[in-house]
Amino acid sequence: MAVIAFIGLGQMGSPMASNLLKQGHQLSVFDVNPDAVQRLVDKGAQPASSPAQATIGAEFVITMLPNGDLVRSVLFGEQGVCETLSREALVIDMSTIHPLQTDNLIADMQSKGFSMMDVPIGRTSDNAITGTLLLLAGGTAEQVERATPVLMAMGNELVNTGGPGMGIRVKLINNYMSIALNALSAEAAVLCEALGLSFDVALKVMSGTAAGKGHFTTTWPNKVMKGDLSPAFMIDLAHKDLGIALDVANQLHVPMPLGAASREVYNLARAAGRGREDWSAILEQVRISAGLTANVKK
């Protein structure tokens, strides 16, 4: 079993640390909230008065903190991790922070001769409690292999995301999709209600279409990602249908800001001459708008 310093015992960190204890790992814990520390001490952890004290003798140092500035302070600040960190130890940041902060932290740790990887998590606090988190491992092959037994005490699925800093990048994209879709789904649900439509009926229909399953796993793999823009559903028709939905919403005084923004993306594609292409060609149009090279020639 490993000797671990765990720093950051919030809503996610506390149950994650608890699961490490359940698997027999030796934990030293630190948090600015003494009550959070005491709850882990009651379960068998050793309390620490600072990140530096927690790190003494640790093989792994896990940080689970609210933002990148705090991670930097914990690592490099007064009584920080680096004051007592062994050159053989591995630092694992599991916080959700800005990817560029992650890159800088890893580079700064490497410049001091230390090893660090990022492993942000997916799923919810309930999964943190049950030890069924999704672990997005960003590190070298050696780091991922070494950390896996410790990480799997906190989760049941580990994805090697392809190198240092890649974990937080895929977490960022996943959260962006989830959060934006949550708002778009709310617009659709309220429009259902305003139209007098049973939400259960709408849910049954959408669960079998791209609306419920998502384009990453339905339309895109079969069309644009194969280099095929022949229309299964034309952008012109998608634009028309979206316009009808927005017109109905306007008449019912239902705000649809995300839907309106989406229509402008389809307008852009039509202006670029893509109206008769498959609606998955939106991906290509957004790539071009971002200054990237199109993958599929028109």
Swiss-Prot record:
It is an enzyme of class 1 (oxidoreductase). Pfam families: NAD_binding_11, NAD_binding_2. The keyword Oxidoreductase applies. Its EC number is 1.1.1.373. GO terms for molecular function: 3-sulfolactaldehyde reductase activity; NAD binding; NADP binding; oxidoreductase activity, acting on the CH-OH group of donors, NAD or NADP as acceptor. The active site is at residue 171. NAD(+) binds at residues 11-12, 31, 65, 96, 240. 2,3-dihydroxypropane-1-sulfonate binds at residues 123, 174-178. The keyword Lipid biosynthesis does not apply. SUPFAM superfamilies: 6-phosphogluconate dehydrogenase C-terminal domain-like (SSF48179), NAD(P)-binding Rossmann-fold domains (SSF51735). It catalyses: (2S)-3-sulfopropanediol + NAD(+) = (2S)-3-sulfolactaldehyde + NADH + H(+). Keywords: NAD, Oxidoreductase. It comes from the Bacteria. GO terms for biological process: 6-sulfoquinovose(1-) catabolic process. NCBIfam families: PRK15461.1. PANTHER family: 3-HYDROXYISOBUTYRATE DEHYDROGENASE, MITOCHONDRIAL, 3-HYDROXYISOBUTYRATE DEHYDROGENASE-RELATED. Belongs to the HIBADH-related family. 3-sulfolactaldehyde reductase subfamily. Reduces 3-sulfolactaldehyde (SLA) to 2,3-dihydroxypropane 1-sulfonate (DHPS). This is 3-sulfolactaldehyde reductase. It comes from Salmonella typhimurium (strain LT2 / SGSC1412 / ATCC 700720).
